Amino acid sequence: MKKFAIKFIAFYQKYISILLPKSCRYYPTCSQYAIWEFQTNSFFSAFFATFMRILRCNQLFKGGINYPIIRKKFNSCFIFQKSDTKNVNFWFIPCQNSKFYVVKVLDKLKEKN
């Protein structure tokens, strides 16, 4: 279901969103936020977070920078494992206890590696 949701949002971005004026009050845009949520969260958590984000995206709210926040537990041994940094897609920036901001790695930085 997550893959279907991501493909549906990608279809919206590619074919429908370009026909409409840019009106999202947040960075990342609501559709990009939804894709990040579905890539890093469970389906229902991502759906709820996306739904709440779309409800906040109007003239009654200030807008601004609003990265997805996920809950994640890392194993301590994970830190010491050798990993391939070329496959890093997201940075998890600590926010609160086991909650992290999700920040997408720029494609330009991926190409340099």
Curated annotation (Swiss-Prot):
- Membrane topology of the entry: Peripheral membrane protein
Where in or outside the cell it occurs: the entry states: Cell inner membrane
- Iron as a keyword of this entry, yes or no, is no
Give the Pfam families listed for this entry.
Answer: YidD (PF01809)
Sorted alphabetically, the Gene Ontology cellular component annotations on this record are:
plasma membrane
Question: Transmembrane segments in this chain: where?
Answer: none
The answer to whether the entry has keyword RNA-binding is no
Q: Which UniProt keywords apply?
A: Cell inner membrane, Cell membrane, Membrane
Give the family this protein belongs to, as stated in its UniProt record. Belongs to the UPF0161 family.
What does the record give as the function of this protein?
Answer: Could be involved in insertion of integral membrane proteins into the membrane.
Instruction: Tell me what this protein is called.
Output: Putative membrane protein insertion efficiency factor
